[in-house]
Amino acid sequence: MNPLLILAFVGAAVAVPFDDDDKIVGGYTCEENSVPYQVSLNSGSHFCGGSLISEQWVVSAGHCYKPHIQVRLGEHNIEVLEGNEQFINAAKIIRHPKYNRIILNNDIMLIKLSTPAVINAHVSTISLPTAPPAAGTECLISGWGNTLSSGADYPDELQCLDAPVLTQAKCKASYPLKITSNMFCVGFLEGGKDSCQGDSGGPVVCNGQLQGIVSWGYGCAQKRRPGVYTKVYNYVDWIKDTIAANS
């Protein structure tokens, strides 16, 4: 994440005592089409990530909210038209009603696509979790965020990072009095690997289920400052109810 206090996968600045951080540091270039649920949120340029959870719905971070968003699916190199992309405007953008921009609690939003996505080898959905994330589970984090812990280098190609879920005790010890029951940590206490600016809103997938949303952190890939993620399991009912009410 940033050398400053930051939000670990955010695209636009947020007026909070954190700095936006939405990139992958210490990862690797994803194999093309290996993360078909990953989307890019665009408002003239990429600013956040997201995850396709049904043909017409995307989940992202609440701090990624903008009034007008184009969702770009099937992307790998976001600077090149590769022929597999689907660009679909948002019809509805619904941030969690209890989203708190100061502490980033309930950092989640849903985006309804104006037309359903075409599901194929390049674009597909990711399952919602059936149980909360267990400590020690290896997860895949992906995004087009900054790849440097100091300075800036934004990749054109989607980046991936394999990282473990940390215990809630280690998460709370890393950020005293800042971790709510709706947050969890993924990463390495020794630093060197993390999400960062530009990754915000993107997926944390563990055992084939969307367990996390890139939310915030202090800097990127700093020692004893792992990335903090929205715990999707806590919002499964809200997601299902919101989709049903807006179908």
From Swiss-Prot:
Species of origin reads Homo sapiens
List the Gene Ontology MF annotations in alphabetical order: metal ion binding; serine-type endopeptidase activity
Q: Which residues bind Ca(2+) per the record?
A: E75, N77, V80, E85
Q: What is its main location?
A: secreted
* Record keywords: Calcium, Disulfide bond, Hydrolase, Metal-binding, Protease, Secreted, Serine protease, Signal, Zymogen
Q: Which family does it belong to?
A: Belongs to the peptidase S1 family. Tryptase subfamily.
Q: Where is the active site?
A: H63 (charge relay system), D107 (charge relay system), S200 (charge relay system)
Q: For the site Required for specificity, which positions are given?
A: D194
Gene this chain is encoded by:
PRSS3P2
**Location relative to the cell:** Secreted
On whether Disulfide bond is a keyword of this UniProt record, the answer is yes
GO CC annotation terms, alphabetical: extracellular space
- Annotated disulfide bonds: C48-C64, C139-C206, C171-C185, C196-C220
Q: Which SUPFAM superfamilies match?
A: Trypsin-like serine proteases (SSF50494)
Q: What does this protein do?
A: May regulate cell migration.
The region annotated as signal peptide is 1-15
Q: PANTHER family of this UniProt entry?
A: TRYPSIN-6-RELATED, TRYPSIN-RELATED
Q: What is this protein called?
A: Putative trypsin-6
